[in-house]
Regions:
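Extracellular jelly-roll beta-sandwich "head" domains, especially the C-terminal globular C1q domain
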Residues: 1-149
Length: 149
């Protein structure tokens, strides 16, 4: 999945070894909570840049992946920042850049209500570098939702 702006991750594969749920819209990327309870949500997102960085990131640029409840009220449930190399060699070099390839892992437990809708999002937060989500070597993206109670 090639992206360069903030977006919801869509177009999921649910064939073996992955699995589907009647609550998951793999095309739109939305999971609708079937029953009120406690849920474990996990995601592993591999990525790679599609071009070399030519400038340093600004201090406020912190791209991330977020599992967000989009309905009934938009709420970030868990987020993970991209790994950033932050180098400052006095009077010579000040560099801040995302790694060319990396992995962001998200995990948490949440009290959710039947009918809540959640999705996995890329939040660019000022990053304009094109990304290949899933990584250059097809390591992929996996996210799962499990009811605990």
């Amino acid at each position: 999945m090639a992206i360069s702006t903030s977006t919801q991750l869509t177009g999921w594969t649910v064939t073996t070894p992955f699995y589907d749920s009647p609550s998951f819209d793999e095309v739109g990327g939305n999971y609708t909570i079937p029953t009120t309870g406690r849920y474990s949500i996990e995601a592993t997102i591999n990525y790679s840049t599609t071009a070399s960085l030519s400038i340093s990131l600004g201090a406020g640029v912190n791209p991330a992946f977020v599992v967000q409840r989009t309905s009934p009220t938009a709420t970030n449930l868990v987020s993970g920042l991209f790994p950033v190399l932050d180098v400052n060699v006095a009077l010579i070099l000040d560099l801040r850049a995302i790694l060319g390839s990396g992995t962001v892992t998200l995990a948490g437990e949440f009290a959710l209500t039947a009918g809540d809708v959640i999705g996995l999002f890329y939040v660019a937060n000022g990053l304009t570098v094109p990304l290949n989500l899933g990584g250059a070597n097809s390591a992929g993206i996996v996210w799962s939702v499990h009811e605990l109670t």
